[in-house]
């Protein structure tokens, strides 16, 4: 079993290298505090256009300032182009340079809940804040035009973190590599909630598709790639029991906002 698992992983890693995919594989729990904070927001339908503009004009500028100061290593605001009852209107993803830098965000929260100042709070409200780790992520060398990307966000709950890590390594990552090989997926991030207590997500997948056409091929490509993996014993084992490992909740299609009214 160990030899088989190593061969499967080596094959996946070789394919990822050929694709130019930067990847991270989680083998053990993190040894420091979480450096990722994710915040979701809800806005009344009448306020959504103004809230979108506020995020692009004001919020992104404040986050860029924090990045310039070295507090953030990366940030992103995703906006749901549709009004949906059971998800969110916007989500901010903050990647901090160090765990200690998250204290700066706590200070901001004292006067700007969820990072929103008074003007922002008139347009929307922060709903949930998650402290998370980012054990798995990757991106192709040439992801295409930023403004064309379509983001697909999938929350999961699981019963065992250790089993879930093995599931992602053996079942999810080989498929993700295949989707990248097919040219439809240009990047992915898989977060794990550091404090998964209560009816919140334990793991959050954020996929970036090359464009709307590529996103439309999602089901076709999933089926095609799975056919190439079905003869791998470890992949097949997790495929057969995946429903006992995790539970999926409502997905969100989103665009990444950028200054000036576009998406990225």
Regions found by a protein language model. Give the residues of each.
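N-terminal secretory signal peptides that target proteins for export/translocation
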Residues: 1-7
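Bacterial N-terminal signal peptides
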Residues: 10-21
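Short S/T/G/P-rich N-terminal loop/turn motif that feeds into the first structured element of a domain
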Residues: 26-114, 121-231, 236-264
């Amino acid at each position: 079993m160990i030899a088989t698992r190593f061969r499967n992983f080596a094959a996946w890693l070789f394919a990822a290298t050929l694709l130019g995919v930067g990847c991270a594989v989680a083998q053990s729990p993190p040894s420091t505090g979480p450096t990722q904070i994710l915040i979701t927001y809800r806005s009344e339908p009448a306020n959504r256009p103004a809230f979108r503009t506020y995020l692009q004009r004001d919020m992104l500028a404040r986050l860029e300032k924090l990045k310039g100061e070295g507090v953030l290593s990366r940030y992103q605001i995703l906006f749901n182009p549709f009004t949906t009852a059971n998800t969110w209107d916007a989500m901010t993803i903050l990647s901090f340079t160090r765990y200690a830098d998250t204290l700066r965000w706590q200070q901001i929260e004292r006067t700007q809940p969820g990072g929103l100042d008074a003007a922002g709070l008139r347009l929307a409200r922060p709903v949930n804040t998650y402290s998370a780790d980012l054990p798995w992520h990757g991106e192709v060398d040439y992801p295409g035009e930023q403004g064309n990307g379509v983001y697909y966000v999938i929350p999961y709950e699981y019963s065992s973190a250790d089993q879930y890590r093995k599931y992602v390594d053996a079942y999810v990552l080989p498929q993700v590599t295949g989707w990248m090989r097919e040219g439809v997926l240009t990047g992915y991030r898989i977060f794990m909630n550091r404090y998964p207590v209560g009816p919140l997500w334990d793991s959050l997948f954020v996929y970036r598709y090359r464009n709307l056409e590529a996103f439309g091929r999602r089901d076709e490509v999933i089926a095609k790639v799975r056919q190439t993996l079905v003869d791998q014993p470890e992949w097949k084992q997790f495929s057969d029991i995946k429903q006992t490992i995790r539970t999926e909740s409502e997905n969100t299609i989103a665009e990444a906002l950028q200054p000036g009214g576009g998406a990225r």
